[in-house]
């Protein structure tokens, strides 16, 4: 009982002492979110609505008509999720993309084909927070997102299936009746079954782009043919003439075309081109 009375006395003393203490005053209690508006730099304010508007402007202004480019335009027209950007800026996966694209000229493909300058310029502006009035942060993010997706899909589809559709390109070179101005039929010069990039392949590649295996998948799309590897090594030589480099580039592209291989021994005849193998 004595212990209980003692504890009760202590609690009563502490309670009375606490009641006599002055209330704690917080110096920032009057600050609201509106009070922070003066600290906000509008130059760095990201607007999802503005980013979408700029992406729509880029895709509508695009004159590219390849299957990959049309796929990308439909992807953003349907309001699908962004792959390379978010409200914090650019994803680190863009660095992996740039790293792989930086070596594309070793494959006899120009960096212009994969919008390398647009991507690196936009990425640099975001990292340095260096924006211009006519290219603000929202435009820069939109440019990075749009061109990164086009570049990525152009690269993986081009390295796997070829950057040129041989049937579409070669079968529109010669007219059947060149002297007849009314004739619109072309002579068939390429009639070999060749694999083509499809929506399923691009869907699977976009899933890889949003994951950590991005760089690995990009490198896995490279042609493994030993003849292609030999041509690639020759293309890296510094003593080649322009004509030699062009010839190597054309043959490297031909090895990218995926043609079905027969089982065992077989004869392959390209009738339109009169080639017997």
Where are these regions (language model features)?
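Bacterial N-terminal signal peptides that target proteins for export
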Residues: 1-7
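A broad, structure-centric signal for solvent-exposed, well-ordered loop/edge residues
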Residues: 7-8, 259
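C-terminal motif of bacterial Sec signal peptides marking the signal peptidase cleavage site
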Residues: 15-18
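Auxiliary tRNA-acceptor-end handling modules of aminoacyl-tRNA synthetases
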Residues: 20-277
């Amino acid at each position: 009982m004595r212990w209980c009375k003692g504890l009760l006395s202590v609690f009563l003393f502490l309670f009375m002492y606490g009641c006599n203490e002055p209330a704690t005053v917080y110096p920032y209690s009057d600050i609201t979110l509106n009070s922070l508006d003066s600290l906000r730099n509008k130059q760095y304010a990201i607007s999802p609505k503005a980013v979408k508007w700029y992406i729509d402007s880029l895709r509508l202004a695009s004159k590219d008509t390849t299957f990959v480019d049309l796929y990308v335009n439909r992807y953003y027209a349907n309001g699908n999720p962004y792959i390379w950007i978010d409200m914090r800026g650019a994803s680190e996966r863009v660095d992996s993309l740039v790293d792989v694209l930086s070596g594309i000229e070793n494959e006899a493909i120009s960096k212009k084909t994969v919008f390398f300058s647009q991507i690196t310029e936009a990425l640099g502006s975001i990292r340095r927070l260096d924006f211009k009035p006519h290219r603000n942060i929202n435009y820069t993010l939109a440019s990075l997102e749009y061109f990164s997706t086009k570049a990525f899909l152009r690269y993986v589809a081009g390295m796997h299936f070829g950057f040129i559709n041989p049937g579409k390109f070669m079968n529109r070179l010669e007219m059947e009746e060149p002297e007849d101005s009314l004739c619109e039929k072309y002579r068939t010069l390429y009639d070999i079954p060749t694999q083509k990039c499809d929506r399923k392949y691009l869907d699977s590649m976009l899933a890889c782009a949003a994951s950590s295996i991005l760089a690995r998948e990009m490198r896995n799309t490279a042609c493994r043919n030993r003849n292609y590897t030999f041509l690639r090594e020759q293309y890296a030589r510094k003593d080649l003439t322009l004509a030699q480099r062009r010839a190597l580039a054309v043959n490297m592209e031909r090895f990218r075309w995926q043609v079905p291989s027969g089982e065992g021994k077989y004869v392959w005849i390209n009738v339109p081109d009169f080639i017997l193998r």
